[in-house]
């Protein structure tokens, strides 16, 4: 870890709130933020940058190491929703890089979030951050161009995913008009019903606003 890294830097936190643009790494395997577990702090963190050049350099390093990633630009108007979505993914920290300086910021230090069991209208709030996070790690590893056979970590993730799935509550989609259930076709033979870990994942699927969620 870089010697310049520090924790809870207020200047960095302020910039994360006010910069006109930021950049983040996105996994080429999941199309979601690239997440890593810090070996010293065990933070589940994403990588963010104040400049496109720094983001591109880091992406190049990882791609050369066989880890497929890209970069995404975040405009100021997108940032609050982006930060909030990290909670539903089980991500708790941001590793912010600028030149040779790295600053680890805890998500809860600048995006506070109350998560009641029910919303004001009495509807159950469905989220599965542990499942979402484990699935991200699993897919980042198993969809790499070269996967280490017999990796015990992969089996551990599979077991955790099965456990979280059996205990969780999920969102299904039905058509607003009628009760039709949308399905996802992977090929001519495999057809699946789509279910979602949380409302944000449901909204990604419901871009035309023709569906309603049920738990």
Where do the language-model regions lie?
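An interfacial alpha-helical scaffold signature
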Residues: 1-215
